[in-house]
Amino acid sequence: MIKRIAILGSTGSIGRQTLEVVDRSEGRLTVQALAAGSNWKELLAQIEIYRPRLAAMMETEAAERLAEALWERGLPIPVVTGEAGLAEAACLPEVDTVVTAVSGAIGLGPTMAAIEAGKEIALANKETLVAAGPLVMAAARRREVTILPVDSEHSAIFQCLQGQDRRLARLILTASGGPFRDKSLEALHQVTPEDALRHPNWRMGPKITIDSASLMNKGLEVIEARWLFDIDFDDIEVLIHPQSIVHSMVEFADGSILSQMGLPDMRLPIQYALTYPERWQTGWPRLDITKTAALTFRRPDLERFPSLELAITAGRTGGSLPAVMNAANEVAVHAFLDHRIGFMDIPRIVREAMEAHEWQKEPDLPAIRQADAWARRFATERVGEGREVSA
């Protein structure tokens, strides 16, 4: 089997680890298109190694710099720009599977385009299903497109369901709890971006690392699981599991529970999504269960981590609210990373956006984009108002 792939977000954490998987594939995975946001220098280095047919960049100026550098090196690889450019990379005829590894709701358009083009989707961009889960899954069914999860938790559930009777009792999503899982509510008001970026277990990009620290990431994953596995919110539970060894669990109607275990290494679910239904040998470190300390689980504290409850509330409400919640969170997280607001301002801004939004029950894609844009404007205004920036 040779699979031809496009990687949207190739210079990010998931994108770089996807290329590590490609490197070990012995030619069974080939890169046809690479896309990034603004890091044209790293994308140039990747192009020199993997020689894709097409390159895409979100930012126009970065695309111009990349095109100039490619011309100077005698590499006749076309460069396209913007969201339309990402969609063009995703829809390239020579591509079999699209790895959507971009961060944020910007992944929605290219993912939908890839689905309409009949491409298999290796989904690492959870915001796509958060913002437009019903529309995305309906399009995938209509086009008979397979969506394979890359998130470790959803990959774990997907693996546990293979060959099983689908009469489920519940899904159990595990969360490391992030770097602040044992901090008091008072202490959370003082944490800095540098504190939040020190994740104890996983190697991830900055936005998702902050979401992990606030437990917003787990709330987004609850919504993603609802749509990927067609299960009610009442049947999805979140447990804090500090060791990050059990990646998620499935409880069946008879009370049996299956789990998928392994070291916290994103290359494993990435490879599984790209090679499914096969399993390829790896040379990466493996879990030695005899050397593993006790595995512990506890329920999350929603008072200290209100973002989790906000996300689940948005998911239960549905309609346009998940897109608003997600967009407001993106703005707030980037403001926190820039030291413009405090950590606990993130859920405050998200809550205010959700409360102010004029809800739509069944938005189409343009309406979802409008809700997203409104929430970004609203959250941006709130960033400049009353805040508790850490010293």
From Swiss-Prot:
Entries under InterPro entries matching the protein: DXP_reductoisomerase, DXP_reductoisomerase_C, DXP_reductoisomerase_N, DXPR_C, DXPR_C_sf, NAD(P)-bd_dom_sf
Pathway involvement of the protein, from the record: Isoprenoid biosynthesis; isopentenyl diphosphate biosynthesis via DXP pathway; isopentenyl diphosphate from 1-deoxy-D-xylulose 5-phosphate: step 1/6
UniProt keywords, alphabetically: Isoprene biosynthesis, Manganese, Metal-binding, NADP, Oxidoreductase
Listed cofactors: Mg(2+); Mn(2+)
Catalysed reaction, written as an equation: 2-C-methyl-D-erythritol 4-phosphate + NADP(+) = 1-deoxy-D-xylulose 5-phosphate + NADPH + H(+)
GO biological process, one term: isopentenyl diphosphate biosynthetic process, methylerythritol 4-phosphate pathway involved in terpenoid biosynthetic process
Chain residues that bind Mn(2+): 151, 153, 221
Binding site for NADPH: 11-14, 37, 39, 125, 127, 205
Pfam families (UniProt xref): DXP_redisom_C (PF08436), DXP_reductoisom (PF02670), DXPR_C (PF13288)
GO MF: 1-deoxy-D-xylulose-5-phosphate reductoisomerase activity; manganese ion binding; NADPH binding
Binding site for 1-deoxy-D-xylulose 5-phosphate: 126, 152-153, 176, 199, 212, 217-218, 221
Residue spans crossing the bilayer: none
Entry EC number(s): 1.1.1.267
Domain of life of the native organism: Bacteria
Family under the similarity heading: Belongs to the DXR family.
Role, per record: Catalyzes the NADPH-dependent rearrangement and reduction of 1-deoxy-D-xylulose-5-phosphate (DXP) to 2-C-methyl-D-erythritol 4-phosphate (MEP).
Family annotation (HAMAP family): DXP_reductoisom
The protein's name: 1-deoxy-D-xylulose 5-phosphate reductoisomerase
Species of the source: Heliobacterium modesticaldum (strain ATCC 51547 / Ice1)
